[in-house]
Amino acid sequence: MNDAELREAIVSAAYLEGDFLLRSGKRSRYYLDKFRFETRPDLLAALGERIAAAVREHEPEAVRLAAPVLGAVPLAAAASLAGGLPFVIVRDEAKGYGTANRLEGVNVEGELVCLVEDIVTSGGALMDSISAVREAGLVVRSAVCVIDREEGGADALARHAVRLRPLFRAGDLLQGEKTPAKPHG
């Protein structure tokens, strides 16, 4: 599947119109439902290959991927299979049972990891994961996402010394049809 076919398949599978409240608290007239492209084996495999290639190109020294729960986990698994890098899962919070870790999977202090994310809007979810990864002693300086909604997330991450590498930008993905999210309230 080439880039144009992948772009078309993502839009066809995931683009919804209506009135949606985003995680950032903003409202939007369109929504890109990540689960509609992450649960399709053909799209997940293609995205895993693209993410693995982006990591090799933009963070070649990374020894591990890191994926925030829930949406980024299938993407990191697909990229891990495609590129051979292991990954850790970043929980929203440590659980009070089992290992009680916020990061699940094997990791070694000082390792360089690359974050994987599905869709970035304001960057808030990724900034929380960056904090967790850094608190665990890992180094993070880049993130690869499937879609950047172009609503300030890349700038927010840059303020935390993390470069965002999107596979697609909303404006390109939707060919100029992007409707900016509006503040909630």
Show where each model-derived region lies.
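Active-site-facing substrate-recognition patch
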Residues: 1-58
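PRPP-dependent phosphoribosyltransferase catalytic core
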Residues: 2-12, 131-185
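Solvent-exposed alpha-helices and their adjacent loops that cap or buttress functional pockets
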Residues: 24, 105-109, 136, 156-157
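Phosphate/pyrophosphate-binding loops at sites that engage ATP/ADP/AMP, CoA/4′-phosphopantetheine
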Residues: 51-63, 130, 134-136
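Short glycine-rich phosphate-binding loop at a beta-alpha junction
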Residues: 60-69, 144-145
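Structural detector of well-ordered beta-strand residues that form the stable sheet scaffold
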Residues: 65-66, 88, 141, 165
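Short, glycine/charge-rich flexible loops or terminal/linker lids adjacent to PRPP-binding catalytic cores
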Residues: 76-114, 122-127, 180-181
